Amino acid sequence: IQIFRQPERPDQLVPVWPESPAPLVYRLPDANVELEFAPADFIQVNAELNQRMVTRALELLDPQPGESVLDLFCGLGNFTLPLARRAGRVLGIEADAMLIEKAQRNAQRNQVQNAEFRLADLYSPETPDPWGAERFDKWLLDPPRTGAVEVVKRLPAQGGPRRIQYVSCNPGTLARDSELLVHTKGYRLAAAGVMDMFPQTSHVEAMALFERAN
């Protein structure tokens, strides 16, 4: 157990006990990945369900050694590094510079050399595509509650990724973005389900796999 005091902002956390705390880590044993994080970082608080969620996402997306995968809203690498264990190359995009730094350190910690991370605001329609002209075989989206509508709008009508794995903490915005994917971007819903990430509450984690129809 570690105890911290937060006077005001998240970056003002002060350790109370012990005075020199060891780094906090969580593990994804199916992917042989260990991720370091700070007390104020966003992580999934249900460690067991997070492990199952990552495993299931990889089963559905099915990355292959010769494929490139784009991980949007990648955070500190929760999906990126497990994806990199199986794909040829993974690019993670995140708007938080501190999380990008931690994702890079986590890649080094796990000796992952085929994952790259870039800083970009995925919610700004004026921001150029942070992946530039690069094309990716598969995408994984794990956005905040507001969803990924601006990202979905960036998808070309033809020639987009073959599969898109969408992980959502808000079924409402997932439904909205799914409508765009299916009715305007040429995808079909191939699989869907929920995980009870917060038992005895109304909140669930939803997952949906989309495949390019054409």
Regions found by a protein language model. Give the residues of each.
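Rossmann-like S-adenosyl-L-methionine
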Residues: 1-214
